[in-house]
């Protein structure tokens, strides 16, 4: 269309956007009030995507090619949140949902084909805050059509919803205080209601309304440039001078890794495996982020130069060896100290980083390569595998069965860290049940804890109760507090498994 700005269409459909956003704000509060990962969260995400698509239909914004990927992956993450009890996975799922939803909206309203990696990230991070400059828009849009009867009615409906929903909650809280039976039923659905929770609900409704309306008002303006700005690239010589010494340093470092670490000529020199693995990983992460920035700057701000391209390629290739070095050290660490969620995440991240570096190298020689989209797809697909894997199940299964190999040279002192098992998520319950059925009842009653002293050596202590009893009590407490909106499939299965159902 010639007129890219859709603000006029949004104002013409104020009745829909005003009432629809108010209802959406109520739906948001109903689903997410004191509910972080239950079935209501999954319904909220599904409802949100439907509402966004409905808004775009009103603005005559057609679903673009590639948008299905965003819609499907967001829903998969929402389903994953419902079927896992791991708070770390749930938190990362929500982060992924935010980035994918923001990318979906930007992709729908703007021609983002020529956006650079940094421009995409800038717009995604900026999107949650654009509503601040549009907080007045609901009132302005109404005022423009104030003489039209239907728009007066629309405003009255919006005001009625914004006032009526909080008032309903306050009265509901009073009724809960007046009758124990009514309070118990309400608590199973919404949790405890009082004046404090009423204030919180009012805030959630108002915040959801103004944030959602403001974001769509911003998107409707289509104020972002569709094309990458034409800039005169700088001479490549300064970049070459900066990158060549770094590349030489990387090559020396990689040679040392190959000769000393992979060649078996390595001496820990007093460092524990924990210190060595953690230092190696986080240092590598910093170097890889730096490499990404340097490569982006190299082909984004400097003229194409053969020497520069080769230098950046060698620098990126050296990172492969750094990744292999980090993975080798982490695997040795796991052999001695078993698995934890962080150690699994480190290994997963190294695999993802290897694939991402391939995209970075391609982008050096093919400037038009869509690095952001490539990175988005790689990270999303790999993370979905991690999210649906129920990591705690595999960690618990591995650690418990490794305990049966106590005394082997590769297993540090032949001990299982039972204190770690006590605090695992509901995803681990099935592994515990399988282990006990395989004859591990003695280990299930172990009361041994472990911690690391200042010298890195393991020290042991006696727990007040065995780890399985403590874990079962934790799961029972969570199951009892779950409620209808917070119903979680993993918590439900854990309760049945632990009690032999």
Which sequence ranges carry the predicted segments?
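N-terminal signal-anchor module of multipass membrane proteins
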Residues: 1-55
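Transmembrane-helix bundle segments that line or gate the permeation/cavity pathway
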Residues: 31-181, 204-205, 209-221
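Extracytosolic and intramembrane catalytic regions of membrane-associated proteins
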Residues: 419-501
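Hydrophobic alpha-helical transmembrane segments in integral membrane proteins
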Residues: 384-413
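Short aromatic-rich membrane-water interface segments that cap or initiate transmembrane helices
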Residues: 189-204, 269-287, 339-350
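Terminal, non-globular segments
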Residues: 93-108, 195-223, 239, 246-251, ...
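Juxtamembrane membrane-water interface segments of multi-pass membrane proteins
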Residues: 2-15, 56-66, 112-119, 138-155, ...
């Amino acid at each position: 269309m010639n007129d890219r700005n859709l603000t006029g269409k949004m104002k013409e459909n104020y009745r829909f956007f005003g009432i629809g956003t108010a209802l959406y704000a109520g739906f948001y509060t109903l689903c997410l009030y004191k509910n972080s990962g239950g079935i209501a969260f999954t319904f909220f995400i599904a409802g949100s995507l439907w509402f966004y698509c409905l808004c775009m239909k009103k603005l005559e914004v057609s679903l673009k090619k590639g948008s299905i990927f965003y819609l499907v992956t967001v829903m998969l993450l929402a389903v994953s949140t419902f079927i896992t009890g791991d708070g770390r996975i749930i938190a990362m799922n929500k982060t992924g949902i935010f980035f994918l939803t923001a990318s979906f909206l930007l992709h729908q309203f703007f021609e983002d084909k020529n956006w650079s990696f940094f421009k995409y990230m800038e717009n995604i991070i900026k999107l949650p805050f654009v509503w601040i400059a549009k907080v007045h828009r609901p009132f302005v849009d109404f005022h423009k059509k104030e003489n039209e009867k239907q728009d007066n009615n629309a405003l009255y409906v919006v005001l009625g919803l914004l006032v009526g929903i909080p008032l309903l909650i306050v009265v509901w809280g009073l009724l809960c205080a007046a009758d124990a039976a009514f309070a118990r039923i309400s608590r199973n659905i919404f949790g405890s209601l009082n004046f404090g929770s009423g204030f919180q609900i009012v805030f959630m409704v108002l915040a959801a309304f103004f944030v959602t309306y403001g974001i769509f008002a911003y998107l409707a303006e289509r104020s972002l440039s569709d094309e990458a700005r034409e800039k005169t690239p700088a001479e490549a010589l300064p970049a070459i001078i900066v990158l060549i010494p770094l590349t030489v340093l990387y090559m020396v470092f990689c040679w040392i890794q190959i000769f000393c670490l992979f060649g078996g000529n390595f001496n820990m020199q007093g460092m524990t495996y924990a210190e060595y693995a953690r230092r190696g990983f986080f240092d590598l992460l910093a170097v890889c982020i730096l490499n990404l920035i340097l490569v982006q700057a190299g082909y984004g701000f400097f003229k194409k130069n053969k020497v520069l391209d080769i230098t950046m390629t060698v620098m990126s290739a050296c990172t492969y060896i750094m990744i292999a070095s980090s993975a080798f050290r982490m695997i040795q660490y796991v052999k001695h100290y078993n698995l934890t969620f962080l150690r699994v995440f480190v290994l997963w991240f190294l695999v993802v980083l290897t694939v991402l570096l391939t995209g970075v190298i391609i982008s050096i020689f093919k400037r038009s390569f869509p690095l952001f989209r490539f990175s988005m797809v790689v990270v999303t697909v790999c993370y979905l595998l991690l999210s649906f894997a129920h990591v705690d199940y595999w960690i618990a299964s591995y650690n418990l069965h490794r305990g049966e190999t106590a005394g082997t040279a590769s297993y540090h002192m032949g001990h299982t860290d039972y204190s770690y098992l006590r605090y695992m998520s509901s995803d681990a319950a099935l592994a515990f049940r399988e282990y006990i059925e395989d004859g591990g009842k003695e280990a299930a009653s172990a009361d041994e804890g472990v911690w690391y002293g200042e010298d890195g050596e393991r020290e042991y202590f006696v727990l007040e109760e065995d780890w399985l009893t403590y874990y079962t009590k934790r799961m029972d407490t969570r199951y009892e507090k779950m409620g209808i909106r917070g119903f979680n499939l993993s918590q439900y299965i854990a309760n049945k498994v632990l009690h032999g159902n």
